[in-house]
Amino acid sequence: MLSRKCGSLSLTLKNFNSTLSVAYSASDAALKIPIADPSENAASKYANKPAKTLNDAVRERSERFRSRVYTAKIPKLHEEQVSSGFSSPCNKLRSFLHSRDYMAFLVELTLQSRMDENFGAKMFQNNDLSIAEFSAFIEGLLSVNNLLHKLSATLPNVSGTEMVFSLYQLYLKTVTPGPLSPLQLHDFNKFIRFFIRSAQLRKAQTVLDCILKSNNNQLPCDSATATHYLQLRCGALPRNWKVLDENLGRSTRLGARKNRYQLVSHSYKALDHKSVLTFMSLLSDPKSVWFHRKSAALESAVVYSLGFMGQLKLLEEHVWRNWGISLQEHNQVTDASFTSPSSEVLVAVLTSYASNKNISSALHLIDGFMAKYPTLELDHVFWRRLFQWSTRVWSEKTDPRGELSRGCWRVMREWHAARNRQLPADAVLLNERFVVLSRTNNYRDAIEVVEQCYSSFFQKANLSRHEAVLFQKFAKLILKNMAHLGYYHKPLKFIKEWSPNKLLEHTLRAYFEKHRNAYSARKQRRTEAAQKAQKRFDDEEEDSMLLGRLW
């Protein structure tokens, strides 16, 4: 067990991977949901600007992909039709779908819908495009990385979220009254996930309301839907939480420093404080249908909801009932019937406690998880969150030597060493570690980071700009301290051994020489000052001796 104490901070550290339910419509498992006004949880709304560039965009993308479509292997029966161009908009859509050009599909569909408001309905009524094909398009489109960024680059004058919401409204025309089919439920959850990631929580609430209304205001027994309900109604979206940052001295959104296409909502709050208690009971009861529907995402959402509401006592009870881990040593359960949690659950536990200014309890529980479940797999996201929280809650006043971050590093190192694994070369994690090392001026631990992690970085063909800049930060911290301590051969050896290229080697050498010269000049000034002081002392001694003789 690793223990560190600094001021009032007492830490205990030790050796420390969403499913869709097809049978979602089980009436005995559906949950009655309290009615809430989703408009209270509104996110910023884009204006629906006129899309004068749609026609041009479709034409450009059509020309770009036409050659690929034409040269595809197709039966001779259709060669004349294809060679003469697209005979109809629906043929265009099918071509885009088959070539997996989902962006062009969306642009063309939007253009046709604006020219003819009934285009979507006619398309499905005439069976020009099947529901399965349309679902495949939605699956492909909403799986595109940075979709909003790519839409804004293709159509700079059009709101990407409004285009996707119009797509959802078109999809509604295919839905008949009654419970949704498993495919429809899956597609609706894809829409919700997209709107959540785009910080369009009002639109996500609208889709969720449609799911609930189709099921008589009951929650279908489906893991993904339940997860989204907890995220939208019960506070299980930590990216939108507002938490105090000790380093900044003010509260910030947890997701505020993520990439600019992972947006956060500034009006996030919990609308339902009761359903999470129901989920706690159902997920802990082996006789419940929900017990067999639970997933890592759903379990994490319950933990996040309790953390957002500040219900740490209920959270401790939930952890104890589901995994046999307690903050009280005598309450630990050794029953082998418990199943090891996922890394995602531990991230939720850590975030829930740390956001309530109780990271020591989070670390104690994590210590218990690692002791009870030796086969527990902790992915890079867990270690990243651990260091992000250790930096966010760290205060130089209570922990001037950065023992919290150092303890987390030691635990991570020992966990990987016990499994004969290399430490993760994660730039985000290393940047969090550097923040503490630089502010505590700890160059020795910085050397350890470079020696244990950067060999993985240098195995890559090319370092990214961010990785190169981060390495320079570590190297400069080390070289500056070595220079100030009077080292010469040791820093030169470090530069030669760890510089990934000649350019960086030259930069680091010049940086070291600069601080080495400053050290030499400072040493020279001190020597001269000492010599002058000694001379004054000698002169005073000589004068004293002369005066003594006179007496």
UniProtKB/Swiss-Prot annotation:
Predominant subcellular localization, coarse grouping: mitochondrion
Matches recorded under InterPro entries: ATPase_expression_mit
Ranges for region Disordered: 530-551
Domain of life: Eukaryota
Gene Ontology biological-process entries: regulation of translation
Any one cellular-component term (Gene Ontology): mitochondrion
Membrane is among the record's keywords: no
Coiled coil stretches, renumbered: none
Keywords: Mitochondrion, RNA-binding, Transit peptide, Translation regulation
Gene Ontology molecular functions: RNA binding
Subcellular localization, as worded in the UniProt entry: Mitochondrion
Job of this protein: Required for translation of the mitochondrial OLI1 transcript coding for the mitochondrial ATP synthase subunit 9.
Subunit structure: Binds to the 5'UTR of the OLI1 mRNA.
Family assignment from sequence similarity: Belongs to the AEP2 family.
Protein name: ATPase expression protein 2, mitochondrial
